Amino acid sequence: MWELVALLLLTLAYLFWPKRRCPGAKYPKSLLSLPLVGSLPFLPRHGHMHNNFFKLQKKYGPIYSVRMGTKTTVIVGHHQLAKEVLIKKGKDFSGRPQVTTLDILSNNRKGIAFADYGAHWQLHRRLAMATFALFKDGDQKLEKIICQEISTLCDMLATHNGQTIDISFPVFVAITNVISLICFNISYKNGDPELKIVHNYNEGIIDSLGKESLVDLFPWLKVFPNKTLEKLKRHVKTRNDLLTKIFENYKEKFRSDSITNMLDVLMQAKMNSDNGNAGPDQDSELLSDNHILTTIGDIFGAGVETTTSVVKWIVAFLLHNPQVKKKLYEEIDQNVGFSRTPTISDRNRLLLLEATIREVLRIRPVAPMLIPHKANVDSSIGEFAVDKGTHVIINLWALHHNEKEWHQPDQFMPERFLNPAGTQLISPSLSYLPFGAGPRSCIGEILARQELFLIMAWLLQRFDLEVPDDGQLPSLEGNPKVVFLIDSFKVKIKVRQAWREAQAEGST
């Protein structure tokens, strides 16, 4: 009996023990690992994973490996090595791991965010970037779209003058409408039932993906009942059903001579491919309805929750740092005043605000470990070999909290991004990659930066953002899911007296 058990264990150890492709090569240091479960028993069980990986650097160095179940994962925690992965060898490491939950979210690895490297991903990323080029000038200028939604947001917040509210949903609505206009020229009115559907499925997906899922480490577990997986499937289906409805309705309106949004760009590419008018890289199979909807879903999902979350982080840090908030009010009053609304051109004048946004993106990065990469070929990082198929995680948290790169990295200090006189923005460290870099960098970076600047400039021009009367400050601990979320909090909204007086004077 025991002989059979021993034989079984030896067989499993042989099958699942990591095998080196290049026996003589030098590999990164590795945590202890066991057959089947890998390094899981030896990883810290409490605290945020990004911070735990950061702490492990003290023992294993800025690059090391762990066995996540049966897969080898290399953790990179230094900016030079990170840029080697993302930029210098970006093509080598531009793959995406196959993960059960993300396969569900991406309709079996379609779209952009979670699709593996290949012709499909390259095509859809190129088409998505072409879409953003549509919004550079004229009536469709990105700034104009953002400002019209922020104006509606501010009007709504003004109805809560003197009240203590959670700004999450109002900000979500504004940013959802910006993305919706970019994707398919739709802007939702407050109270629209479709808007509630978007909000609910978005929260459901993020909540499902945020739970530690053994099925991602051990895919064979998906044959067993799994409430989290079922919840994810349910919300993804809701998303897909809504996008399909919008897509089918839009097909009747599509005009190839009027390309104004992302759905137009994708549909035109599909039409050209079907008619044989496209290049060899534009296979019609890569532009099926399912492919198109998944790409729209990616842009919609990634563009909404990330920016909404960062706006809330900025407000939270300002509530904790009233001296910074006071300086921001002074900066806006002196450089913009109240006779006009802020514009993107004000970024050259509102330097402290821009520095504040950069500091929040440093101290609370949207994705503390980015989205995992995968080695497409046998390659290397620094002096270490990395085998094809190895998963690679860039620990952005480590880059942004390295004491050798940042003075007091755990302290909120927007002034670190300004010269001593406060008259010029600077880059205090190369260890700063809030939007990633290279082939897999965030394609919505320009949009996100404009949204963050304009939303905060408009809010600070019009409203006093105050700690509630009960003195309850937001928690800055955070909740790392797909996006590094901040726990719900409330802020007291008061229309600024100077703004009210300026509006009254302007109307007379």
Swiss-Prot record:
Pfam families: p450
UniProt family annotation: Belongs to the cytochrome P450 family.
UniProt function note: A cytochrome P450 monooxygenase involved in corticoid and androgen biosynthesis. Catalyzes 17-alpha hydroxylation of C21 steroids, which is common for both pathways. A second oxidative step, required only for androgen synthesis, involves an acyl-carbon cleavage. The 17-alpha hydroxy intermediates, as part of adrenal glucocorticoids biosynthesis pathway, are precursors of cortisol.
Residues that, per the record, bind heme: 442
Catalytic activity of the protein: a C21-steroid + reduced [NADPH--hemoprotein reductase] + O2 = a 17alpha-hydroxy-C21-steroid + oxidized [NADPH--hemoprotein reductase] + H2O + H(+); progesterone + reduced [NADPH--hemoprotein reductase] + O2 = 17alpha-hydroxyprogesterone + oxidized [NADPH--hemoprotein reductase] + H2O + H(+); pregnenolone + reduced [NADPH--hemoprotein reductase] + O2 = 17alpha-hydroxypregnenolone + oxidized [NADPH--hemoprotein reductase] + H2O + H(+); 17alpha-hydroxyprogesterone + reduced [NADPH--hemoprotein reductase] + O2 = androst-4-ene-3,17-dione + acetate + oxidized [NADPH--hemoprotein reductase] + H2O + 2 H(+)
Name of the protein this chain belongs to: Steroid 17-alpha-hydroxylase/17,20 lyase
Annotated GO biological process: glucocorticoid biosynthetic process; hormone biosynthetic process; progesterone metabolic process; steroid metabolic process
Regulation of catalytic or functional activity: Regulated predominantly by intracellular cAMP levels. The 17,20-lyase activity is stimulated by cytochrome b5, which acts as an allosteric effector increasing the Vmax of the lyase activity.
The protein's enzyme class: oxidoreductase
Gene from which the chain derives: CYP17A1
Binding site for substrate: 202
Lineage of producing organism: Eukaryota, Metazoa, Chordata, Craniata, Vertebrata
The EC number(s) this enzyme carries: 1.14.14.19, 1.14.14.32
PROSITE patterns: CYTOCHROME_P450 (PS00086)
One GO molecular-function entry: lyase activity
CC annotations in GO: endoplasmic reticulum membrane
